[in-house]
Amino acid sequence: MPIAQIHILEGRNDEQKETLIREVSEAISRSLDAPLTSVRVIITEMAKGHFGIGGELASKVRR
């Protein structure tokens, strides 16, 4: 059972996350020749104040 864990900054809507899950699942299924029903995708959303980019908080870099 392939499992993909993806960390993203908060702010995406459910439709965007659903698209991400579907497309990642399809890519994993295709590339590993695994049944689509066996693929798991975990999305972890991070607050922009809990992530750094180039030494600064993402909340300051990305608005």
Swiss-Prot record:
In alphabetical order, the GO MF annotations are:
isomerase activity
Q: Which GO terms describe its biological process?
A: toluene catabolic process; xylene catabolic process
What pathway does the UniProt record associate with this protein? Xenobiotic degradation; toluene degradation; Xenobiotic degradation; xylene degradation
Superkingdom in the source lineage: Bacteria
Catalysis performed (reactions): (2Z,4E)-2-hydroxyhexa-2,4-dienedioate = (3E)-2-oxohex-3-enedioate
* Tagged with keyword Isomerase: yes
> Does the record bear Ligase in its keywords?
no
List, alphabetically, the Pfam families matched: Tautomerase
Transmembrane residue ranges: none
Q: Which cysteines are joined by disulfide bonds?
A: none
Q: So where's the catalytic machinery, residue-wise?
A: 2 (proton acceptor)
**What's in the keyword line of the UniProt record?**
Aromatic hydrocarbons catabolism, Isomerase, Plasmid
Its EC number is 5.3.2.6
InterPro entries given in the database record: 4-OT, 4-OT-like_dom, Tautomerase/MIF_sf
UniProt function note: Catalyzes the ketonization of 2-hydroxymuconate stereoselectively to yield 2-oxo-3-hexenedioate.
Quaternary data: Homohexamer.
Protein family: Belongs to the 4-oxalocrotonate tautomerase family.
Q: What is this protein called?
A: 2-hydroxymuconate tautomerase
Question: From what organism does this protein derive?
Answer: Pseudomonas putida (Arthrobacter siderocapsulatus)
